[in-house]
């Protein structure tokens, strides 16, 4: 989940899964030369958390962390010098069959789907079949966006949709169980039965600021279909996936029978298998891509080479530069988010579908990158693997952990903090069990916390610093959540 999204959402991308632990490296994984195998071992043994605690162990082994986080299947691809240096699968695709993960194993990519979608939409712009800065209703045929007074007379453009600056509702999608009646795109956009989400509507005028909207991405999917007169998955295969060599990947929902033997099974936070093994996402552009790290690495490499004018399998250098240029927001570009570390820019995206989470990063200039995917709702390990790759391959200042020292607090002081807090529909409880302190989310997920001062605490599992705020009488009233420059506030519930 990108930091621009509400911070409380992060809990549901990194909650701990429970159940069986994973086995080691899957069969049919390629072997490499000694130098590369040595690098792989270094990556496997150098996982690091977002925060370093003074006087404690700060690096871990991949297998240990998979067991600790109860991760069943994990797959990695590492890019170096504009090439896939290595790719490897770990664990099992399904806890019943115990089938090992390979580099071919397919995962749902969640919102990473948006990156390839933007590529497909920009291909239409490049071919002069649409204009990025024209009212979307110019291209919509099977449905029209219902403008109202909220948009203040301003028109939404495709550029707004791709950069999450359209001022639209509907952050994401839960998908549908296999066997459910699947809604059409117009039904989804209008929130009509059998759609399981609210209508996609204006919440503020377009072009004003960033607000993440999978609903807006779904409008872009319908535009692709209405302009090309092709099913979305067919257009994306012929114009994006196939040209990139992403031969294992597909936007087809549900996946074809030919792909079934490659599909990893999805698992929920409580360790239970997602009913039907995975959800179906008719919102293909926003969440419907099935892929693996090796295929996504091909997309990253093509983006890097196109940016340098060395390849144009899908987009020209000019169009690739446009795709990677933030639009209105300081970091949200077209289907990607841009960040900078040590003077190097990176493009990337996170993904989360039911029972799957993933992340990728690609550098602008150095030819480095990484993709990590797991078949669990637990995303805590993604950052740790990425940090390890960045450290082993010398990505300057990419991994700069927060350093904290644990302090002890009295029971009397803790009692002033204990209780329930409320934020955007979610309840957060501060409690103690034995000698340990916990943050409990909606009475379901429990995170061990440590105090770094008398008013500040953290969890190694959540990249957020929490701070208690008191009123004039010295009574605790709020908890501030801070992630980077983003802040949210959870208010203490009355009678606590």
Residue ranges and their predicted role:
Residues 90, 94, 148-355, 359:
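Short, surface-exposed loop or secondary-structure junction motifs
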Residues 93-103, 381-387:
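A short, polar/charged loop-to-alpha-helix boundary motif
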Residues 77-80, 136, 140, 251-259:
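Short, solvent-exposed turn/loop segments enriched in Gly/Ser/Thr/Pro and often Arg
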Residues 60, 118-119, 134, 218, ...:
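A generic alpha-helix surface/boundary motif
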Residues 1-31:
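Bacterial Sec-dependent N-terminal signal peptides
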Residues 46, 65-77, 96-160, 202-215, ...:
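Short active-site loop at a secondary-structure junction
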Residues 43, 47, 92, 135-144, ...:
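Short linear capping/connector segments at secondary-structure termini
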């Amino acid at each position: 989940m990108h930091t621009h999204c509400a911070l409380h959402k992060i809990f549901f991308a990194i909650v701990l899964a429970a159940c069986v632990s994973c086995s080691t490296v899957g069969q049919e994984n390629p072997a490499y030369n000694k130098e590369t195998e040595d690098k792989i071992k270094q990556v496997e043994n150098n996982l690091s958390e977002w925060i370093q605690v003074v006087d404690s162990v700060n690096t871990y082994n991949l297998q240990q962390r998979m067991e600790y986080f109860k991760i069943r299947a994990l797959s990695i691809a590492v890019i170096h010098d504009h090439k896939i240096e290595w790719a490897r699968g770990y664990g099992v695709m399904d806890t019943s069959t115990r089938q090992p993960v390979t580099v071919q194993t397919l995962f749902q990519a969640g919102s990473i789907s948006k990156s390839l979608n933007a590529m497909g939409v920009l291909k239409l712009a490049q071919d002069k079949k649409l204009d990025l800065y024209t009212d979307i209703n110019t291209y919509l045929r099977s449905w029209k966006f219902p403008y109202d007074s909220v948009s203040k007379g301003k028109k939404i453009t495709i550029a707004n949709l791709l950069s999450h600056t359209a001022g639209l509702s509907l952050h994401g999608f839960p998908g549908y169980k296999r066997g459910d009646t699947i809604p059409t795109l117009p039904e989804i956009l209008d929130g009509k039965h059998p759609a399981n989400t609210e209508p996609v509507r204006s919440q503020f005028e377009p072009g004003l600021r960033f607000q993440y909207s999978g609903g807006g991405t779904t409008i872009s999917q319908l535009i692709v279909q209405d302009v090309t007169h092709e099913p979305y998955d067919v257009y994306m295969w012929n114009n994006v996936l196939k040209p990139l060599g992403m031969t294992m990947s597909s936007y087809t929902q549900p996946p074809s029978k030919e792909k079934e033997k490659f599909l990893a099974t999805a698992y929920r936070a409580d360790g239970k298998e997602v009913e039907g093994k995975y959800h179906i996402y008719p919102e293909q552009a926003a969440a419907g891509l099935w892929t693996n790290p090796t295929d996504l690495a091909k997309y990253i490499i093509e983006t890097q080479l196109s940016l340098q004018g060395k390849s144009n399998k899908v987009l020209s250098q000019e169009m690739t530069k446009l795709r990677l240029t933030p639009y209105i927001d300081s970091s949200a570009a077209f289907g990607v988010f841009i960040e900078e570390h040590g003077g190097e820019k990176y493009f990337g995206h996170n993904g989360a579908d039911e029972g799957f989470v993933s992340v990728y990063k690609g550098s602008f200039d150095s030819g480095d990158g990484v993709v990590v995917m797991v078949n669990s709702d637990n995303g805590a390990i993604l950052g740790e693997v990425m940090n390890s790759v960045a450290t082993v391959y010398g990505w300057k200042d990419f991994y700069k952990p927060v350093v904290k020292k644990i302090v002890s607090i009295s029971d009397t002081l803790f009692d002033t903090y204990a209780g329930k807090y409320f934020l955007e529909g979610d309840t957060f409880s501060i409690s103690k069990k034995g000698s340990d302190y916990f943050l409990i989310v909606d009475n379901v997920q429990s995170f061990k916390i440590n105090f770094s001062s008398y008013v500040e605490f953290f969890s190694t599992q959540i990249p957020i610093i929490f701070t208690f705020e008191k009123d004039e009488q010295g009574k605790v009233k709020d908890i501030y959540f801070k992630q980077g420059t983003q802040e949210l506030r959870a208010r203490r519930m009355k009678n606590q």
